[in-house]
């Protein structure tokens, strides 16, 4: 399967399966060149711009987190996003390993308004 990353900031919303990656990749370099920190609120997405921010909402619980996209993946056909350990923990996905989520890109300016 081929993915073509978005080259501009545009609205994006999708529902699909999230997974998480943790200890095995902790300390490894991400696609952005940053070092992966399983305790940071980050995620890997196949097409969202690096860097960008997304709100990820677990459809079952309604819990939401905001993550910074700093890596590419997941490269498993049925997966939409790979969350850091801590993001998955906050969404309640650690024990099951995966779960259905909605991913919405946060456009520039919106994040600023949230944290004023």
Give residue ranges: language-model regions.
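Secreted/periplasmic proteins
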Residues: 1-116
């Amino acid at each position: 399967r081929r993915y073509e990353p978005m080259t501009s900031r545009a609205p994006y919303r999708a529902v699909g399966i999230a997974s998480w990656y943790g200890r095995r990749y902790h300390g490894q370099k991400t696609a952005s060149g940053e070092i992966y920190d399983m305790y940071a609120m980050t995620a890997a997405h196949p097409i969202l711009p690096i860097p960008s921010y997304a709100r990820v909402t677990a459809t079952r619980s309604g819990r939401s987190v905001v993550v910074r996209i700093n890596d590419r993946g997941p490269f498993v056909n049925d997966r939409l996003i790979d969350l850091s350990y801590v993001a998955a923990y906050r969404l309640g996905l650690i024990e099951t390993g995966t779960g259905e989520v909605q991913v919405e890109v946060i456009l520039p300016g919106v994040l600023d308004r949230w944290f004023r």
